[in-house]
């Protein structure tokens, strides 16, 4: 049977599966069967006598970990290999070694909302203006520090950066508050384990001995903390197999370091490198479009992607007049395919760069009766009623959890107001108590009146009754909470229709608890359930078998595949995102993101943009994404939108590249990657790439034929310019060169900042600074 399994693998896949000793780097292109390789390699390790307890497989999503676990079980029934996400693995390690980092083993994992509450309290106590220094910005800075293994003591602000100075003050206070509550945020899970392994050699050696074979999926997405953990666990037994693709590294904004995979061969000179280049997912046309696009990136490891699938249809590129036309046309097309019986709803996926772009699609699909699902697994656990019930459970599990106590002490209402809570907090701070400990002393707090003290004492008594059930099955604990707190009754008595929906959501949470109880038989079921609820991923709620159209961001689409994919709003400022402007590394990541979106498609792919789009409260003309210039013309079908009077038509999309001057050919610009830029003009067919798409004048619908265009090079940083519609403005940023040279202009008229492609632009310099 095993020989048949091996025969089903390609030579490259088999090479990876049979390499069992020493480091291994598997460079796996999209749709190349990497999960199959990982699971077969685990099965092969088991066949060669490696105990299951010595094998650790790490990935990034619960769905991927569950799929890996199920496939290993199929190949090697009865073998319990630990397949886990990084965060869940670190949470388990921390519970086993909590005292080493100053925690109790029943610590609470705070989600983003809970962490923000702690941060806001710290800012208030430190008398820092949250309007000037928002909790979100400070939280992002602290997260960056933790992902880069900078503790509160090690963090140093850069000179002349006010926010950094504030973070240097707040970070230690924030960490102290977390430790006092025996709590961690998501980033702490990694930071604490990395520092624990660094500072405790015996613990590190013990864990290295325990996990003698480590496999890491999606290695290109690891940050410094994850990299450090993996390195620390593979010193004595360097049997580390990592799988990944530098071309699919799309999480730099949350700390992922592309160098981890690019430099793997430097870290492990004796490494075996295996390339999985055959794609089993997409048509030849789709794969050629993706491969051509990603060729413009410089920080990558070249692969020769190929497929034996059919040639397939051309990739469609559609320009719509507005985002409403875009949404309605896509919805109508999907509805027609479903009605004709050619496709099921689950065959379709619509991707976008940011969630805010989904609204018009939702309306359009709903109007046509097309069932759809939004992929956001976090959404359920962020609902008020769910967070309320989970807060009760957190407090039962960890009495020092001040954030959870503040959420539930007056929920449902118990006549415990803000003034009472402030006095409790003051008492707790004075005597270094948790809020629950302070509440137990409410009768001794002189500043509390008798009524308030009695109300607090009643809550403490309620808590004590609930905590008796801490070791019971989770569904049973939840039932006691709903009944004894009066929470269910409070919602049932409400005449608010929204509260009836909340009851339905609570029933769903009870179902989740019941399913957990049926499959988990270890110690501390409540602790494990809360850990699972806290470490939900975006895609966990996505049901692959649910017969609905899927709407999701391209980040969430990672690792998935669909027969038909639509990618909307391929426009400058959205894809690539505006924050990548003038940042080559971020621009390459945006290109990788589009590459990921394209390679999710199996049979059909459409990219689209709208000439006018309402976004963030503004109606504006758009600029086509520069990535559209990088797609291979021969594989594309450009479709114009109606009416024909729109400011920019797709018929003008393709210029005759043969008529361009040599230095204006897009793929010959100086900023094109070396591996894309030909050494001679005959080294590459000139019809391979798109010509420049349009001009700012076209987009604005202005006739500038009577006035000669100003050369793009004439515009300089700081120049004051005149626009026929927006008036006077100042150039605040420049990017690109030649026909791609673009300027961001801040207008004095209140029009805000707008970006223009300068070739034949309506902008005119007033003066040059």
Q: Which residue stretches match the model-derived regions?
A:
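Conserved helicase motor core of SF1/SF2 NTP-dependent helicases
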Residues: 32, 220-309, 426-430, 437-439, ...
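Conserved two-lobed SF2 helicase motor
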Residues: 83-88, 192-193, 547-554
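Inter-lobe coupling/hinge region of RecA-like P-loop helicase motors
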Residues: 2-10, 14-18, 22-28, 53, ...
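Acidic, low-complexity intrinsically disordered tails
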Residues: 1-3, 633-724, 730-733, 742, ...
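Conserved helicase NTPase motor core
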Residues: 2, 7-18, 22-26, 36-37, ...
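Conserved helicase C-terminal RecA-like lobe
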Residues: 160, 299, 344, 358-370, ...
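Helicase P-loop NTPase motor core
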Residues: 30-38, 42, 269-272, 277-371, ...
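Conserved P-loop NTPase-based nucleic-acid remodeling module centered on helicase motor cores
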Residues: 54-141, 146, 150-162, 169, ...
């Amino acid at each position: 049977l095993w020989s048949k399994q091996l025969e089903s693998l390609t030579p490259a896949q088999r090479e990876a599966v049979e390499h069992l000793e020493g480091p291994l780097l598997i460079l796996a292109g999209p749709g190349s069967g990497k999960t199959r390789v990982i699971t077969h390699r685990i099965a092969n390790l088991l066949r060669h006598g490696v105990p299951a307890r010595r094998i650790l497989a790490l990935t990034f999503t619960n769905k991927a970990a569950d799929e890996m676990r199920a496939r290993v079980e199929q190949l090697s029934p009865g073998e319990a290999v630990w397949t886990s996400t990084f965060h869940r693995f670190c949470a388990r390690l921390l519970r086993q070694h909590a005292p080493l980092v100053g925690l109790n083993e029943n610590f609470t994992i705070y989600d983003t909302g809970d962490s923000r509450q702690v941060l806001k309290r710290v800012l208030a106590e430190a008398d820092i203006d949250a309007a000037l220094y928002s909790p979100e910005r400070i939280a992002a800075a602290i997260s960056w520090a933790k992902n880069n293994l900078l503790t509160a003591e090690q963090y140093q602000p850069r000179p002349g950066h006010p926010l950094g100075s504030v973070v240097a003050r707040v970070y230690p206070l924030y960490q102290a508050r977390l430790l006092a509550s025996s709590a961690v945020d998501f980033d702490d899970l990694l930071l604490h384990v990395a520092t624990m392994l660094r500072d405790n050699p015996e613990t590190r050696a013990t864990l290295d001995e325990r996990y003698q074979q480590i496999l890491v999926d999606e290695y290109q997405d690891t940050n410094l903390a994850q990299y450090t953990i993996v390195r620390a666990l593979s010193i004595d037994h360097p049997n580390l197999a990592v799988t990944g693709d530098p071309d699919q590294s799309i999480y730099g904004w949350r700390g992922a370091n592309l160098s981890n995979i690019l430099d793997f061969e430097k870290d492990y000179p004796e490494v075996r490198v295996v390339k999985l280049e055959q794609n089993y997912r997409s048509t030849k046309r789709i794969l050629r479009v993706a491969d051509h696009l990603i060729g413009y990136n410089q920080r990558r490891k070249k692969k020769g992607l190929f497929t034996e699938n059919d040639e397939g249809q051309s990739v469609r590129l559609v320009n719509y007049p507005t985002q409403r036309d875009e949404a309605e046309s896509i919805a109508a097309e999907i509805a027609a395919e479903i009605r004709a019986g050619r496709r099921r709803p689950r065959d379709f996926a619509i991707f976008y760069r940011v969630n805010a772009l989904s609204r018009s699609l939702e309306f359009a699909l709903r109007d046509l009766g097309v069932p759809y699902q939004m992929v956001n697994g976090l959404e359920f656990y962020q609902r008020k009623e769910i967070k309320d019930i989970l807060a009760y459970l957190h407090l039962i599990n960890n009495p020092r959890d001040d954030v959870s106590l503040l959420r539930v002490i007056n929920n449902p209402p118990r006549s415990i107001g803000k003034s009472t809570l402030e006095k409790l907090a003051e008492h707790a701070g004075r005597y270094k108590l948790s809020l629950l400990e302070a509440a137990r002393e409410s009768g001794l707090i002189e500043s509390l009146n008798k009524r308030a003290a009695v109300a607090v004492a009643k809550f403490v008594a309620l808590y004590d009754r609930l905590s008796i059930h801490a070791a019971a099955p989770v569904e049973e604990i939840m039932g006691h909470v709903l009944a004894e707190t009066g929470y269910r009754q409070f919602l049932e008595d409400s005449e608010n229709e929204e509260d009836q929906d909340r009851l339905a959501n609570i029933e769903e949470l009870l179902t989740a608890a019941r399913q957990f109880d049926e499959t988990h038989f270890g110690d501390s079921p409540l602790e494990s359930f809360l850990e699972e609820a806290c470490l939900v991923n975006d895609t966990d709620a996505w049901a692959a078998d649910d017969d609905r159209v899927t709407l999701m961001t391209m980040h969430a689409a990672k690792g998935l595949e669909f027969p038909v994919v639509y990618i909307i709003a391929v426009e400058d400022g959205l894809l690539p995102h505006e924050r990548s402007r003038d940042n080559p590394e971020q621009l390459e990541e945006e290109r990788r993101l589009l590459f990921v979106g394209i390679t999710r498609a199996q049979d059909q792919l459409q990219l689209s943009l709208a000439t006018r789009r309402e976004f963030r409260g503004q109606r504006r003309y758009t600029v086509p994404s520069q990535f559209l210039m990088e797609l291979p013309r021969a594989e594309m079908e450009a479709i114009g939108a109606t009416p024909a009077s729109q400011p920019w038509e797709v018929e003008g999309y393709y210029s005759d590249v043969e008529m361009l001057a040599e230095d204006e050919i897009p793929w010959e610009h100086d900023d094109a990657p070396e591996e894309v830029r030909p050494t001679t003009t005959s080294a590459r067919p000139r019809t391979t790439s798109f010509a420049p798409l349009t001009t700012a004048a076209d987009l604005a619908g202005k006739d500038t034929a009577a006035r000669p265009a100003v050369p793009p090079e004439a515009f300089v940083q700081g120049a004051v310019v005149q626009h026929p519609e927006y008036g006077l403005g100042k150039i605040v940023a420049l990017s690109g060169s030649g026909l791609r040279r673009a300027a961001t202009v801040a207008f004095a008229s209140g029009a805000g900042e707008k970006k223009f492609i300068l070739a034949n632009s309506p902008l005119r310099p007033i003066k040059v600074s």
